[in-house]
Design a protein with these regions (language model features):
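General helical structural elements
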Residues: 9-10, 90
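Alpha-helix initiation/capping motif
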Residues: 4, 21-22, 117, 398
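Intrinsically disordered, low-complexity regions enriched in serine, threonine, proline
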Residues: 2-3, 26
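C-terminal region of N-terminal signal peptides and the immediate post-cleavage residues
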Residues: 18-32
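Asp-box/BNR beta-propeller blade signature and adjacent active/binding-site loops
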Residues: 30-406
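Bacterial N-terminal signal peptides
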Residues: 12-17
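N-terminal export leaders
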Residues: 3-9
Length: 406
């Protein structure tokens, strides 16, 4: 069925954030972190009290799309929340007007997970939502009907992110009966470009969205379902460019030792998918978990396990991105103080995620959620929450993997 198209709603006009004039700064052993930054989203502007939950994708034409949740009532996770977008045609230096991609209309819409479909060139966007007057805690306790609880939606853009189709509900295909909470990403999804599960005949194709959910306690349990051990990970995928969707791997729970929460994914050069997840107060050391899939996200090669070399990361969402190019590293972004959300940093892995090394620190102040996008050889853009959720800041990092700083 062809969905009707609608023009994106533009928010209140405000000036595109301009890059600061200072030159890039390179450490003797690290990449160049540009002192110039832009802020596509500043809380209190554009009709929203706060912006959170960044997600990035680069279109086939090179346009950077920066998605976020526009929260009208404050920084909280429930209430009147829209999925919003700003576009940049100059690598994140300046940004076009704010647009609403998925309007909450008093309800909650969020957890953007965008991806470039390599076959069509379209941008496919998966999001979640629920009634605006319910909370995550109520949903996890089973106090909310399915209609008012977490739902899953897909949209697409065929015009470089200028307009998107209306959200189409795919919940029945990707959410099992009995699951309560449900969240995609947040952050970019993955288009598989190599390996037997890339698509029929080995062509690029499978769209893979990392996600998490919560389950209900066993009958007779004194638990409410709000306990962190009821979180678990899963993935959803499409092999036809986002038309039909299926459930991939589904991690079992409750465990209590590792509690898989917000998850990011990327495809490694050998074709495997690498998953990196937030450990929501599990009993294992550290706050990051990881796993691998050799069949395009349908199953996991092993259960999630702690990632000890990311021990400085607090309990928070993080982003992973395998850079393209011979010998290019796998990157991870997140705060770098284990007991606080501050000091956004980049880590690098040259052994497919077995170990990570701190690559660069982007800022010393408060920082939380982030997402990564490759802008060119050895160059990435990082969109991250900064301040006490004051803004989403975009920074360019160049000179990664031996490339000269730009």
């Amino acid at each position: 069925m062809t969905l009707p198209r609608r023009a994106l709603l533009t928010g209140l006009p405000f000036l595109a954030a301009l890059a600061l004039p200072e030159p890039a700064h390179a450490t003797p052993r690290g990449p160049a972190v540009s002192r110039a930054s832009s802020r596509p989203y500043v809380s209190g502007r554009g009709g929203y009290a706060a912006y959170r939950i960044p997600a990035l994708v680069r279109t086939r034409r090179g346009t950077v799309l920066a998605f976020a949740e526009g929260r009208r009532d404050g920084v909280g996770d429930s209430g009147d929340i829209d999925v919003v977008l700003r576009r940049s045609t100059d690598g994140g230096r300046t940004w076009g007007p704010l647009a609403v991609v998925a309007a909450g209309n008093g309800n909650t819409r969020g957890n953007p997970a965008p991806v470039l479909d390599p076959r069509s060139g379209d941008i496919v966007l998966v999001t979640c939502g629920n009634a605006g007057d319910v909370t995550e805690a109520q949903i996890m306790r089973g106090e909310v009907t399915a209609a008012r609880g977490r739902r899953v939606y897909v949209q697409r853009s065929t015009d470089d992110g200028r307009t998107f189709t209306r959200p189409r509900d795919i919940t029945d295909a990707v959410k099992r009966p009995g699951w309560r909470w449900y969240a995609t990403g947040p952050g970019h999804a993955v288009a598989l470009t190599r390996g037997p599960r890339s698509a029929a005949g080995g062509a690029p194709g499978r769209l893979l969205v990392p996600a998490n959910h919560s389950t209900a306690p066993a009958r007779g349990s004194k638990d409410t379902g709000r306990e962190a051990r009821y979180y678990a990970g899963h993935a959803l995928y499409s092999d036809d460019g986002g038309t039909t969707w299926h459930l991939g791997y589904q991690a079992t729970g409750p465990a209590g030792t590792v509690n898989v929460n917000e998850t990011s994914a990327t495809q490694l050069p050998d074709g495997r998918v690498y998953f990196s997840a937030r450990d929501q107060n599990g009993g294992a050391p550290g706050n990051r978990l990881d796993s691998y899939s050799s069949d395009g996200g349908a199953t996991l090669d092993r259960p999630y396990a702690p990632q000890p070399t990311l021990k400085d990361v607090p309990v928070v969402q993080g982003s992973v991105l395998q850079l393209q190019g011979d010998g290019a590293p796998l990157l991870f972004s997140g705060p770098s103080v284990p007991t606080a959300r501050r000091a956004m940093a980049l880590w690098s892995s040259t052994d497919a995620g077995r170990t990570f090394t701190r690559l660069a620190t982007l800022s010393d102040g408060p920082a939380a959620y982030s997402d990564l996008v490759q802008l060119g050889p050895g160059t990435v853009g990082v969109l991250y929450e900064t301040g006490p959720y004051d803004a989403l800041e975009f920074r360019r990092v160049t000179g990664i993997g031996g490339h000269p700083p730009a």
